[in-house]
């Protein structure tokens, strides 16, 4: 018989013997407090984590909640009173405000009342509390709290004796929220779902994994030919190894394409982490197309049990080993893995989110290394809040940041924009790992760059491209890709790449290109692509064409040319389309104009030229905070977490996903119709999904070409509108792609 005075937090009935298994509220709160204290201890605030844990579920001790949890689970109760409200989170918020004082309640109250709903705007917190009858709610039932203990916990906190920059205050609030949310979910899982709890953790440490990386790189070196390129790669590797024990902070690794940046940056990160006892490495990449390549390499080195992919196109069901598959599914919730590979979108939108599911992982970023690959792809419209966030995480949470690229943007110092509000305030000090005297841009110069600003027709460009047998042509829009692809002759293999192809076909085509380029029996391979291939995709053509764009894009395109130095010099041609055609617009026009404003005799590959280019580009910007995140978050008394979360989106989130009814997806679509929407089905179908602009979607829907099989889930009804080689179209008019970063 269960004691009716027992204060229950969670319960379930054992299926084998029918016995009721109960976790008391005291047990749960202490479990959460211990875990949250451990998490917050990573950045020096264990007492704050403990206070959050001890207070967060005090409202479960209300008679209303105790009656509710018993009735919901079929447990008898003698309490026949009718209660209008059985919610519980607000009580802990009231206690935090009552017992901890005005100065700190802003930090704790919101986290506690929001641990199931997501962080509220500051003004809404007061309104939520005012709606409650404070004294009646607190005194109802047996709600007890050790007030002296909590005060002592707070007094002992180092934060009470330190200062936080006001503009960083929201990051501290969100980080403490993360500690509470993850601790709450984990302690609940430990009681309610022991099987899942046991699958978590138990991954290797970075110290365990470092020898595997060193052995892999040594094997590569031993099997590599004695070429100039390979000698430079070894030089870069050794420099990364030498500098890895430097103090925590901001670092950049600027290495021309083909210089071994991926592995050398990983070596630096792992050795830096081991020397500072850091927890994990988080690698953020702009394109999902690059992630598959990078994650594949890391899994080859460390095993899939130590590398977590977390992005929209990854389906954990693709992991063959059941134990690793289940671990990966669980780890996407909180990033408790040694190595995480994710997108800029997943990373930065989580850092500015108010949602429990997004924020839960954030505390595991503390005392970690963040590698931002292809950093020049960070959107300038969000650059100021992103840089401010990185500074906050470095100063308060002990991370190190490594910026890697062949085209390093200017992220330090002050750059004046078109008006005072457009000034960009960068990071005070970023240390470059590769010294200037290495002159890598000269040593790795394997490409001649020719720029022709004369407006050319599609026919002229197609004819020029067709003069070469193995050639890549990168253009700015889907329209341009269509026009040029159609004009190429069919005398060999011609391929197309854009995001109007579903991820399954896109990755299949990239793999096919890599295979064909190694096949000497296939003399003609011509590829027309949008800019998705120009950063990080490991392909190597002797000749590359690039439609006019910013200097960073031009050099990234040149990085797909003669990467391995197989010929003395590769050739990259920059071309312009005739005025009536599709020339750069919007931000692409800003980038192109910044390049055009540089001296014609510039050394396009020199780091000094790249710096001048970015200064030109930034000086043209109206703002580096286009959604005014500073307004919503930089004043502690006006923290608008929910509003900022809705505003901070790096890509156009008005796009609509359409599932392509094609081959393997057909069976999955039928399952979706029969069984409804499940996490597993959504992840599997993501590989056969294309995101399109709302305008184009309206056209498809207007013609009856898409079918809504479930609310908000659309399938292409007319398969003739999709071509595996070229993607989704509307009556042969190719739609524009949505840029995915």
Model-derived features: positions:
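Walker A/P-loop
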Residues: 247-269
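Inter-Walker segment of RecA-like/P-loop motor cores
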Residues: 303-352
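C-terminal helicase lobe and adjacent C-terminal extensions/tails of nucleic-acid helicase motors
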Residues: 394, 459-468, 474, 479, ...
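SF2 helicase catalytic motif II
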Residues: 344-347, 358-396
């Amino acid at each position: 018989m269960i004691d009716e005075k027992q204060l229950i937090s969670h319960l379930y009935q054992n299926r084998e013997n029918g016995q009721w298994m109960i976790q008391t509220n005291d047990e749960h709160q202490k479990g959460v407090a211990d875990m949250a204290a451990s998490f917050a201890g990573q950045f020096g605030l264990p007492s704050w984590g403990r206070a959050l844990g001890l207070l967060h579920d005090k409202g479960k001790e209300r008679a209303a909640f105790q009656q509710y949890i018993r009735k919901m689970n079929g447990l008898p109760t003698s309490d026949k009173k009718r209660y209008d409200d059985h919610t519980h989170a607000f009580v802990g918020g009231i206690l935090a405000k009552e017992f901890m004082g005005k100065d700190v309640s802003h930090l704790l109250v919101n986290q506690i009342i929001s641990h199931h709903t997501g962080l509220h705007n500051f003004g809404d917190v007061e309104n939520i509390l005012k709606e409650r009858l404070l004294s009646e709610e607190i005194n109802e039932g047996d709600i007890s709290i050790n007030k002296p203990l909590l005060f002592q916990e707070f007094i002992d906190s180092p934060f009470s004796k330190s200062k936080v920059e006001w503009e960083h205050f929201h990051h501290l609030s969100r980080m403490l929220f993360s500690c509470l949310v993850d601790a709450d979910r984990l302690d609940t899982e430990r009681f309610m779902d022991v099987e899942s709890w046991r699958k978590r953790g138990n991954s290797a440490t970075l110290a365990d994994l470092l020898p595997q990386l060193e052995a892999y790189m040594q094997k590569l070196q031993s099997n590599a030919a004695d070429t100039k390129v390979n000698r430079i790669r070894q030089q870069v590797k050794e420099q990364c190894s030498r500098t890895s024990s430097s103090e925590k902070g901001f670092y950049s690794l600027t290495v021309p394409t083909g210089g071994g940046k991926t592995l050398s940056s990983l070596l630096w990160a792992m050795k830096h982490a081991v020397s500072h006892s850091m927890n994990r490495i988080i690698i953020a990449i702009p394109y999902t197309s690059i992630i598959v390549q990078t994650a594949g390499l890391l899994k080859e080195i460390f095993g899939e049990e130590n590398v977590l992919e977390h992005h929209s196109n990854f389906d954990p069901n693709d992991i063959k080993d059941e134990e690793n598959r289940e671990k990966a599914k669980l780890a996407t919730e909180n990033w408790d893995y040694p190595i995480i590979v994710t997108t800029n979108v997943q990373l930065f939108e989580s850092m500015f989110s108010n949602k429990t599911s997004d924020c839960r992982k954030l505390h595991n970023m503390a005392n970690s290394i963040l590698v931002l690959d292809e950093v020049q792809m960070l959107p300038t419209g969000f650059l100021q809040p992103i840089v401010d966030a990185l500074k906050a995480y470095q100063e308060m949470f002990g991370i190190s940041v490594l910026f890697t690229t062949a085209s390093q943007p200017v992220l330090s110092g002050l750059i004046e924009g078109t008006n005072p509000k457009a000034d960009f305030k960068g990071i005070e000090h970023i240390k470059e790992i590769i010294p200037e005297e290495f002159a890598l841009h000269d040593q790795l110069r394997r490409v001649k760059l020719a720029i022709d600003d004369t407006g050319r027709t599609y026919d002229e460009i197609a004819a020029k491209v067709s003069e070469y047998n193995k050639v890549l042509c990168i253009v700015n829009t889907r329209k341009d890709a269509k026009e040029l692809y159609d004009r190429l002759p069919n005398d060999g293999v011609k391929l197309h790449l854009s995001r109007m192809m579903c991820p399954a076909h896109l990755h299949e085509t990239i793999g096919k290109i890599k295979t064909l380029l190694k096949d000497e029996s296939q003399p003609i391979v011509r590829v027309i692509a949008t800019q998705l291939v120009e950063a990080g995709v490991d392909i190597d053509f002797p000749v590359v064409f690039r439609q006019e764009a910013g200097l960073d894009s031009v050099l990234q395109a040149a990085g797909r040319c003669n990467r391995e130095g197989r010929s003395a010099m590769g050739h990259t041609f920059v071309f312009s389309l005739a005025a009536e055609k599709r020339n750069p617009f919007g931000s692409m026009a800003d980038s192109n104009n910044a390049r055009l404003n540089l001296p014609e005799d510039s050394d396009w590959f020199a780091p000094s030229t790249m710096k001048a280019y970015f200064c030109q580009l930034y000086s043209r910007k109206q703002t580096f905070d286009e959604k005014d995140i500073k307004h919503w978050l930089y004043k502690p008394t006006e923290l608008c977490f929910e509003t900022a979360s809705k505003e901070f989106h790096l890509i156009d989130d008005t796009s609509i996903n359409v599932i392509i009814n094609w081959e393997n997806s057909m069976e999955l679509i039928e399952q979706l119709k029969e069984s409804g929407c499940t996490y597993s089905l959504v992840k599997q179908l993501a590989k056969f999904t294309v995101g399109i602009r709302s305008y184009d979607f309206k056209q498809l829907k207007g013609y009856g070409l898409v079918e809504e099989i479930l609310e908000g889930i659309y399938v292409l009804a007319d398969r003739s509108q999709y071509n595996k080689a070229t993607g989704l179209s509307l009556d042969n008019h190719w739609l524009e792609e949505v840029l995915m970063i």
